[in-house]
Amino acid sequence: MAMRSGFLDRRPVLVGLVFLGGCLGTLIRSVIAHAWPSRADGVPWGTLAINLVGAFVLATLLELLVHAGPDRGVRRAVRLCIGTGLLGGFTTYSALTVEAGQRVMSGQWLWGIAYLLTSVAAGALLAWVVIAAVRCVMGKRSS
């Protein structure tokens, strides 16, 4: 006897949620990028901010979902729509590599490499801090 899955566990629905989230995330990123354009001679603050906000929100979301229970039903739908879709479309590591590469190709190789490494390291550190903070808060709530 096959297990009956809920509406939100159906693959086409999940793919659609990723697509919708991705469209919305890309739209939000585009609005921010146009409002805060990168300059060739300075730090691309818009891209850096987008990626750090994305790392913060994704780490928070995933850690909260881990504490909420198994990855199925609404939790899976939220993870895929917001985590994979929206934040996948919102963050822009392709712009990060293009901006770093442009600096390297223009002779500012140290600046380009430093920007790339700093961005990735800052995102990873931010995610680690957020995960630790959520675990601390969630641990206190379950006590």
UniProtKB/Swiss-Prot annotation:
The keyword Transmembrane applies. It is a multi-pass membrane protein. Keywords: Cell membrane, Ion channel, Ion transport, Membrane, Metal-binding, Sodium, Transmembrane, Transmembrane helix, Transport. One of its GO terms (cellular component) is plasma membrane. Fluoride-specific ion channel. Important for reducing fluoride concentration in the cell, thus reducing its toxicity. The chain crosses the membrane at residues 13-33, 42-62, 80-100, 111-131. GO terms for molecular function: fluoride channel activity; metal ion binding. GO terms for biological process: cellular detoxification of fluoride. It catalyses: fluoride(in) = fluoride(out). This is Fluoride-specific ion channel FluC 1. Na(+) binds at residues 88, 91. The keyword Amino-acid biosynthesis does not apply. It is found in: Cell membrane. Belongs to the fluoride channel Fluc/FEX (TC 1.A.43) family. Its main location: membrane. Na(+) is not transported, but it plays an essential structural role and its presence is essential for fluoride channel function. PANTHER family: FLUORIDE EXPORT PROTEIN 1-RELATED. It holds the Pfam family CRCB.
